[in-house]
């Protein structure tokens, strides 16, 4: 289990759950058709933590339970600055690509249903997105997670560059 998941159990945080997609799948065998269900679920605390999971089972309730357990196991932290993301980022997964840009207050979440659900439950209130390539919900969810994993907070950028957070925002004056 991930470190974040253990910290959440200790803190006793409450997470909101959302089912993005329930899809019926069929496997055709010589004995007939085997039906099963695939569920895509998101959990988040609307305060920078979100997880995405997929569950598969013969019955819908079992698939939902598996998807929610998977989502809780895969929780990641997202830096949220004044209700938006700190910088522009591109997330990629297979044939899907999602571009996310910070937006001014009052813009809202401009995104498709899958990306919107993930960013809402992460606590992002203003962001512009553009989905390119495949729009399969599972692939889009993974591309979104891959993108937000590459977000850095201002403090982390400052530490990597050995400057103060104020210098990251305003710029460093060149000597000479």
Curated annotation (Swiss-Prot):
<dbReference type="InterPro" id="IPR020568">
    <property type="entry name" value="Ribosomal_Su5_D2-typ_SF"/>
</dbReference>
<comment type="function">
    <text>Located at the back of the 30S subunit body where it stabilizes the conformation of the head with respect to the body.</text>
</comment>
<keyword id="KW-0694">RNA-binding</keyword>
<comment type="similarity">
    <text>Belongs to the universal ribosomal protein uS5 family.</text>
</comment>
<protein>
    <recommendedName>
        <fullName>Small ribosomal subunit protein uS5</fullName>
    </recommendedName>
</protein>
<keyword id="KW-0689">Ribosomal protein</keyword>
<dbReference type="GO" id="GO:0015935">
    <property type="term" value="C:small ribosomal subunit"/>
</dbReference>
<dbReference type="InterPro" id="IPR014721">
    <property type="entry name" value="Ribsml_uS5_D2-typ_fold_subgr"/>
</dbReference>
<dbReference type="GO" id="GO:0019843">
    <property type="term" value="F:rRNA binding"/>
</dbReference>
<keyword id="KW-0699">rRNA-binding</keyword>
<dbReference type="Pfam" id="PF03719">
    <property type="entry name" value="Ribosomal_S5_C"/>
</dbReference>
<dbReference type="InterPro" id="IPR000851">
    <property type="entry name" value="Ribosomal_uS5"/>
</dbReference>
<feature type="domain" description="S5 DRBM">
    <location>
        <begin position="15"/>
        <end position="78"/>
    </location>
</feature>
<keyword id="KW-0687">Ribonucleoprotein</keyword>
<dbReference type="GO" id="GO:0003735">
    <property type="term" value="F:structural constituent of ribosome"/>
</dbReference>
<comment type="subunit">
    <text>Part of the 30S ribosomal subunit. Contacts proteins S4 and S8.</text>
</comment>
<dbReference type="Pfam" id="PF00333">
    <property type="entry name" value="Ribosomal_S5"/>
</dbReference>
<dbReference type="GO" id="GO:0006412">
    <property type="term" value="P:translation"/>
</dbReference>
<dbReference type="InterPro" id="IPR005712">
    <property type="entry name" value="Ribosomal_uS5_bac-type"/>
</dbReference>
<dbReference type="InterPro" id="IPR013810">
    <property type="entry name" value="Ribosomal_uS5_N"/>
</dbReference>
<dbReference type="InterPro" id="IPR005324">
    <property type="entry name" value="Ribosomal_uS5_C"/>
</dbReference>
<dbReference type="InterPro" id="IPR018192">
    <property type="entry name" value="Ribosomal_uS5_N_CS"/>
</dbReference>
<comment type="function">
    <text>With S4 and S12 plays an important role in translational accuracy.</text>
</comment>
């Amino acid at each position: 289990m991930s470190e974040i998941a253990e910290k959440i159990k200790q803190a006793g945080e409450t997470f909101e759950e959302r089912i993005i997609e329930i899809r019926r799948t069929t496997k055709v065998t010589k004995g007939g058709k085997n039906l099963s269900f695939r569920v895509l679920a998101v959990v988040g605390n609307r305060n920078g933590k979100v997880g995405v999971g997929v569950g598969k089972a013969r019955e819908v309730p079992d698939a939902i339970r598996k998807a929610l357990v998977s989502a809780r196991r895969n929780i990641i932290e997202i830096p949220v600055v004044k209700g938006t993301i700190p910088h522009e980022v591109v997330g990629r997964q297979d044939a899907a690509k999602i571009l996310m840009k910070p937006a001014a207050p009052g813009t809202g979440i401009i995104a498709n249903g899958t990306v919107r659900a993930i960013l809402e439950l992460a606590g992002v209130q203003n962001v512009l997105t553009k989905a390119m390539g495949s729009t399969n919900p599972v692939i889009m969810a993974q591309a979104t997670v891959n993108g937000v994993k590459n977000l850095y907070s201002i403090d982390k950028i400052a530490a990597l560059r050995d400057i103060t957070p104020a210098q990251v925002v305003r710029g460093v004056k060149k000597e000479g």
